[in-house]
């Protein structure tokens, strides 16, 4: 299995995410990398870090895996994802960042065939 560890920048969140990464390694699941969600927000052109800074980067170093990227706290993302249309905010400058993260994930090919789930 391959995993992606997702965290927010807060220390407590990275501690929990680190446990997830350690458990993945114990069961021989590879970790593709770390993504930091709700990394920052922008106000008047300035980045604000309400939950701290670089928690995801620090975690990727601890787990010795790549840091895939940081996703900002952005209302456009929330609104478009709740409406099941992630491309609704493609005019936002952060859209390219999300596409870049997705492309990094797509570079990894599964080491095993995915489990074939049957739904009715």
Regions inferred by a protein language model and the residue ranges of each:
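Inter-motif core of Ras-like GTPase G domains
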Residues: 1-12
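Short, catalytically relevant binding-site loops at active-site mouths
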Residues: 10-13, 39-41
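C-terminal lobe/tail of nucleotide-utilizing enzymes
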Residues: 21-120
